[in-house]
Every structure is written in structure tokens, then in C-alpha cells.
Amino acid sequence: MNTYLLEYKHILTPKKGFSKLFRDYTSESSERSELIAACFHLDYQKEADYYRQLGLLGSRTFERESLVRLLSRQNTRYGATALHLREIEKLRSPRCMAIVTGQQLGLFTGPIYTIYKALTAIIFAKRQKALFPEYDFVPIFWLEGEDHDYDESAQTAIFSENQVVHFKEEPYRRLPNQMVANSCFGEEISRTVEEYLRLLPETTYKKEVSEMLREFYYPGNTFEMSFACTMMRLFREQPLILLSSQDPDFKQLSSRIFLRELSSSPASSYNVVAQSSCLENLGYTAQTKPRTVNLFHVNHLGQRQKIEHPSEDSFSILPDKQRYSKHQFLELCQDHPEQFSPNVVLRPIIQDFVLPTFACIAGPGEISYLAQYRKNYEHFGISMPFIIPRGSFTLVEPKISRIMDKLLQVIGKPGVSRKQIYHAVFGDLQQLKKNAVGVTENPQLETLFEETKTEIRRALAALGPLLSKIDPTLEPLLAASTVQSAKIIENIEQKTWKASRRKHEELLEQILKAETALFPDGLPQERLINIFYFLNKYGTELIDTLKNLLNGHATEAHIIVEL
């Protein structure tokens, strides 16, 4: 199994790849230093900050007993083993810290980076234990089920016959803006599972995959239970703890932040706007737009409703605009915190208030919006944890590896390595196609065409002054001839390209197969393709393989794995 590391700054081929902020955050540059200083509290590349974070967390108090009871109850329900319950028990000690990651619920666990996040949290916790043996570090996976964007959660994709096939589970008796977690599956889920399995090739691992999906995805089960039980089964031999934030007991632990948000509104929004301005001054784009109140109200049907703050002394709940005095609303929140749900601005604050978060494992998009929250963390009186980039992979199947072999043969020069071919594929695939086709066998032909066009323009331009003296009416004819000559050369160039393309049609088709496999729908593979496509082919031990690979590398680089 071959692996290659690519720096994020070189990955430019996907339509929606890695943002400038993320590329700077994972680099070693002056831009990174400025970004860290302005937008974060800790730098994961600085050893001194690790001791500082231990001290910061050690000085805070957490509701550890309540947290252990909550997590034990939840994880037992999801199918936890004795290993998971032992990990949870460690949280009773003030010398136990959490390595937190999480993801929006997804169909059959959603895109494969969900798995990469969990693996990164497990590996990072293990590394910190090795560095600080007197402490414990437990990986916690936050189940983001309070989101009401059902359409985003209810889809996934796999490869089938060199094409990307999408699956989407239609909602069953679902109300508008209802939280995804408690959305139930109808009869349609059984048909979706069977169609998904039908498109997976027959392998020695298909029986295990089929049994798992049928066991957890069935009519009447909720989205969160299906997702959580699947994750627990996949990580049954790993010390990963799952956390559902929609639990009423967790809401009780979060209530102080809810009350602070309401009583100080719109302060947190002003903080995000101010931090966003700082971010934009550094040349980055702000991802998140805060609301006046960064909480939703949750009604008895599980629908998230926007909260407005029309005056200093009142709140209202949309869409009915039910009005409360400030005192009434704060009292409602204190008595019934389960009726409130944080939005994207407040969610990380809740996380790091309730949990002893030593580090948060985040993806490129999350790191971008967390860069907007520094002032808000300070507003709520807590420090930001370490923000660690999640592990990032592209899995290359043998048939795609063979295409890389062919590319190396066709365009490789003495000293060109396989890694450089991947650099070319991930850096500028369109240019690689041109190089592969070669515009015939003459690599200088493109330059010659450009030189020819330039020389013709120059020669015709030199005629201009003389023709003007002879007869000014000749000038338009000269101008038209200049345009026409350029078109003639371009026509010859296009025909040459087409002739060369026909000659290399087979290679271009293979490159297209590789493009589909590496950048399905123009996206990084990890953001679209589902883990069970690969588990069906390579078995659940693939998760252990990826964990071992991640253990051997830092997460500041993208890892290409030839399976």
C-alpha cells in the first residue's frame, strides 16, 4: 500500500477544494502567524500552548458526574461495549480532557470524512496521553442532530460502473424546520437500503455490510439512532464516545450559556461581526452571518423556530411572533432549557462550556467559521481549545492506480516521480490532460502556434503606416485581414488538437475515470462518497488501516492512499 502526502496549498483541482484560510492555517508561513494571533487563542504547533491549555482547563469546573451519567446512558443505548463505558468513566477525574469532533447526521453515516474525523480524534487523544501520561484524553463525537436541514443530511453517494450514483431518502411525515435527529424513516428507507446494496459489487465483505445497514436503517427508526448505532458498530473496538446534544439532560448542562445569550443579546452577534471584520482585513472571507439571537426555540413538535429581539425588554418567536417580556423569556429558558437549540454561532461555545475540551478536530469549513468566534468565546468567559485539522484522505483503488502508471509512462520525464504525477493531478488536472495528449508528439507545438500568431500580427501591423499613405481605405481591409489570419491559425490549431485528441482518446477516457474517482462531481472524494462503498470492497479492517496511516502522519497534509 503506497501513500503520498500533498500540501493543501497544492490542491487546486476540485471545484470546491480547500479555502485560502485553511491552506494558510495548515502551512508554516507569516500569514499563518497573523491568522493565529488575530483569530485563535492557541497554536497547535507550539509546545508551550499545550501546557497552557492543561492549566486553563485545570482551573475550570465541569459538571463531570452529570456528564458521565448522560454519556453512559446514551452510549449504552447506541450499543456501547465495556471499552466505551470505561472511557466515559475517565471523565469523572479532573485530570481527564476531551478531544472533541462531530458531524451533521448523514445517510449511512454520510460522506467518508465523517469517519476521518472520528479517527483523527482517536489518534490525537492517544498522542496526548503519550505526551502527558498523568492525564487522560477521551475522544468524543458530537452527533449534530439539532440541525433542521434534512435535505443535506438525507443523501449520500457511491461509485458504480465508473459513475457517481446519488441516494436521497425522502422525509416521512416530517414537519418544516423539524430537527433531523428525531425524524423517523418510513417504508421508503428499506427500498433505499436495498437499492444501495444492489449497486455494491459482490464481495466477501458484502454480507457484513448488508446486515449492518439493514439492522440500523429500517422504518420507524430515527435518523439519530440509525447514525449513532452504525458509528458505534464501526468503532466498536475503538474508544470513541458519542454525544447527543438534543438530550434534555444535556440542555440542562447548557442552560447557563443559553441564559447568557438571551440576557446579553445582541452582544454575541456584535462580537462575531467584529471578529469577521478582523478576518476580512487579513484577506479572508467570513463564512457565518450571526443573528440577533443565536438560539432557536424548539416547539413540542421538534421544530426549530427563530427568536427575534424586537426591543430591549422583549423577545418573540417566529413565525407566529408570539411575544414574551425579557423576564418571561429568561424564566422559560431557565425552567425549560430543552426548548432551546443553539445555531452555528453558539454550538461550539456550548460544546466547550459543557465539555473539558482540550482540542477540537475540525474540517476546512469549520476552521473557517471558528476563526470568527474568538471574541465570542471571550464574551462567554472561556478560551478556545486547540483547533486541529482533521485527517484528510483520497483513496485510490487499483484500477485508478494503473491509470496513474499510464500517466507516468506518457508524460513522465527522467526524474519525475509518482508523487509528482499526483501533484499534477491535484494541482491542475486540465493542464495535465493537455500534457498527456501533448498536442501531437511535438511538445513545442503550442508555443509555435502562439509565436506564429504573434509574428503574423506584427508583420501585418508593419504594413499599416505604408498602406495609410497609399490609400487610407486600405486600413479596414488590413484590420479585417489581421482578424481573419488569426482565425485561420486558430482553426488549424483546433484541428491539430482534435486530431491529437482522437489519437489519445483512450488515454483521455482513462483520465476521465480517474477524475471521477478522485474528484466525484468536482469535489474532493472525501466530501461525497460514503464509507460503505469502500468497506464493501476492502472490509471493516480498512478503518484500522486508515487509523494506522493517520497515526504515522501529521494532519497538515492530504494523504493519498493507493489501496
From Swiss-Prot:
Coiled coil: 498-518
Entry-linked Pfam families: CC_BshC (PF24850), Rossmann-like_BshC (PF10079)
One Gene Ontology molecular-function label: ligase activity
Alphabetical keyword list: Coiled coil, Ligase
UniProt EC number: 6.-.-.-
Keyword match Electron transport: no
Similarity remark: Belongs to the BshC family.
HAMAP family, A to Z: BshC
Protein name: Putative cysteine ligase BshC
Annotated source species: Pelodictyon phaeoclathratiforme (strain DSM 5477 / BU-1)
Gene this chain is encoded by: bshC
